[in-house]
UniProtKB/Swiss-Prot annotation:
GO CC aspect terms: cell division site; cell septum; plasma membrane
Coiled coil: 33-76
Cytoplasmic topology ranges: 1-3
Primary location group: membrane
Protein encoded by which gene: ftsB
Family of this protein: Belongs to the FtsB family.
Protein name in the entry: Cell division protein FtsB
Cleavable signal peptide: none
Length: 94
C-alpha cells in the first residue's frame, strides 16, 4: 500500500509540474496571452491609421479643398492675385 501511495504522489507531482511549466502549460498560456494583448493593441493602432488614410483618400477624390490645401502646404503654391509672405523667426536668422 505504501508503494501505491508513493507512486500516486509522484504521479501527482509530475502532473502538476507538467501542467504549470510543461509544453502548453499555464506559463506558456500566460505568455501567449500577453503576446495577444500586445498584438491587439498594435492592430488597433494600425486600424486607426488605415481609417485616417481612407478618409484622406476619399477627401482627395471628392473634394478640391483637400487638393488645394496640400498644394499650398507642401508645394508652396498660391492663387492668382494672392501674395505669399514668409515669416522668419529669430532662430532661423542666425
Amino acid at each position: 500500500m505504501r508503494v501505491f501511495a508513493l507512486t500516486l504522489s509522484l504521479l501527482l507531482v509530475w502532473l502538476l509540474y507538467t501542467l504549470m511549466w510543461g509544453k502548453n502549460g499555464v506559463m506558456d498560456f500566460r505568455a501567449v496571452q500577453a503576446e495577444i494583448e500586445v498584438q491587439q493593441q498594435v492592430n488597433a493602432n494600425l486600424h486607426l491609421r488605415n481609417q485616417e488614410m481612407f478618409a484622406e483618400i476619399d477627401d482627395l477624390r471628392q473634394g478640391l479643398d483637400a487638393i488645394e490645401e496640400r498644394a499650398r502646404n507642401e508645394l508652396g503654391m498660391v492663387k492668382d492675385g494672392e501674395t505669399f509672405y514668409r515669416i522668419i523667426g529669430e532662430e532661423s536668422r542666425q
